[in-house]
C-alpha cells in the first residue's frame, strides 16, 4: 500500500475508527519491538511504516477535532 493510498483511506475514517486503528497499530508496533528483542524480526522496515501511519492518523484526529470545535 502506497503512502498516498493509505492517507486517502485514513481520511475516509471517522474519529472512532481512527482511534481504533491507532490502537491496533500501536499493538503491532509493540509486537515488532518484542520480536526484535528476541531476534525473530526480519522485516525491520515495518517500524518506519507503522510509526508513519500512527503519526498520520494522529494528525487527522487532531485536525478533525479542531474542525469540530471551530464549527461549534
UniProtKB/Swiss-Prot annotation:
A GO cellular component entry from the record: cytosolic large ribosomal subunit
Gene Ontology BP terms: translation
InterPro entries referenced in this protein's UniProt entry, alphabetically: Ribosomal_protein_uL29, Ribosomal_uL29, Ribosomal_uL29_sf
Keywords: Ribonucleoprotein, Ribosomal protein
Bridged cysteine pairs (disulfide): none
Listed GO MF terms: structural constituent of ribosome
Segments crossing the lipid bilayer: none
Similarity field: Belongs to the universal ribosomal protein uL29 family.
NCBIfam families: L29
Protein name per its UniProtKB record: Large ribosomal subunit protein uL29
Amino acid at each position: 500500500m502506497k503512502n498516498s493510498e493509505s492517507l486517502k483511506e485514513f481520511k475516509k475514517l471517522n474519529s472512532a475508527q481512527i482511534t481504533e486503528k491507532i490502537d491496533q497499530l500501536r499493538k503491532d508496533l509493540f509486537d515488532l519491538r518484542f520480536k526484535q528483542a528476541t531476534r525473530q524480526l526480519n522485516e525491520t522496515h515495518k517500524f518506519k511504516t507503522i510509526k508513519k501511519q500512527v503519526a498520520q492518523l494522529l494528525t487527522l484526529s487532531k485536525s478533525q477535532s479542531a474542525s469540530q470545535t471551530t464549527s461549534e
